Swiss-Prot record:
Temperature dependence: Optimum temperature is 50 degrees Celsius. Retains about 80% of the activity after incubation for 2 hours at 50 degrees Celsius, but is rapidly inactivated at higher temperatures.
The keyword Transcription is annotated on this UniProt entry: no
Domain GH11 intervals: 24-210
Superkingdom as given in the UniProt entry: Bacteria
Task performed by this protein: Involved in depolymerization of xylan, a major component of the lignocellulosic substrates. Acts as an endo-xylanase that efficiently hydrolyzes the beta-1,4 glycosidic linkages between the xylopyranosyl residues in the main chain of the polymer, leading to the degradation of xylan into short oligosaccharides. Shows high activity toward branched xylans from both softwoods (arabinoxylans) and hardwoods (glucuronoxylans), showing the highest activity on beechwood xylan.
Keyword Ligase found: no
Organism ancestry: Bacteria, Bacillati, Bacillota, Bacilli, Bacillales
MF annotations from Gene Ontology: endo-1,4-beta-xylanase activity
Listed EC numbers: 3.2.1.8
Organism, as annotated: Paenibacillus barcinonensis
Catalytic activity: Endohydrolysis of (1->4)-beta-D-xylosidic linkages in xylans
Identification of the protein by name: Endo-1,4-beta-xylanase Xyn11E
Gene, per the UniProt record: xyn11E
Gene Ontology CC, one term: extracellular region
Length: 210
């Protein structure tokens, strides 16, 4: 969520789940995320398969996306954003949470007028691009476990991903790079989604995830 506008989720389908040994993980989506803080108008459509679309106007904060009920560090996310057109603040991002420790994380491939930043930690090369690594902190803010204090981990692409082409996020590359900076994720994985998020903006998005 935007670091200046954190919110609660409408539906959290994921339960705590710990993993020992992981293999690279792909597969059909099984989780639909559709949350808004009630500001403005957000029209989200849960399409067939891994497709979703959202049109928004003069919103507060919202997040819409498709993904997986149970996360994994080995997730390989494939997607095609046929449309991603924010007017104002918006992200096209791989997004999720861990517990033990409670951490919120992002891999941001595209954005609107605001490119997220934080405390700079370095870079990681992945999937044909270079990402800047940042951390931020949230103090007594809503989370998947109620109001808590927790870090956010970010990988933000230096240049925006092209729209309308098949794209891939190899999450393990980011997990490894974060760990090399002392940014260790938790041992219990909640949901993961390829999301469109907006804050005080308008726009449209149409994304297929697999």
């Amino acid at each position: 969520m935007f670091k200046f506008g954190k919110k609660l989720m409408t539906v959290v389908l994921a339960a705590s789940m710990s993993f020992g040994v992981f293999a690279a993980t792909t597969g059909a989506t099984d989780y639909w995320q559709n949350w808004t803080d009630g500001g403005g108008t957000v029209n989200a459509v849960n399409g067939s398969g891994g497709n979703y679309s959202v049109n928004w106007q003069n919103t507060g904060n919202f997040v819409v996306g498709k993904g997986w009920t149970y996360g994994t560090p080995n997730r390989v996310v494939n997607y095609n954003a046929g449309v991603f057109s924010p007017s104002g603040n918006g992200y096209l991002t791989f997004y999720g949470w861990t517990r033990n420790a409670l951490i919120e994380y992002y891999v941001v491939d595209n954005w609107g007028t605001y490119r997220p930043t934080g405390t700079y930690k370095g870079t990681v090369n992945s999937d044909g691009g270079t990402y800047d690594i940042y951390t931020t902190m949230r103090y007594n803010q809503p989370s998947i476990d109620g109001y808590s204090t927790f870090p956010q981990y970010w990988s933000v692409r230096q240049s925006k991903r092209p729209i309308g082409v098949n794209s891939q996020i190899t999450f393990q590359n980011h997990v490894n790079a974060w760990a090399s900076k002392g940014m260790n994720l938790g041992s219990s994985w909640s949901y993961q989604v390829l999301a469109t998020e907006g804050y005080q903006s308008s726009g449209s998005s149409n994304v297929t995830v697999w």
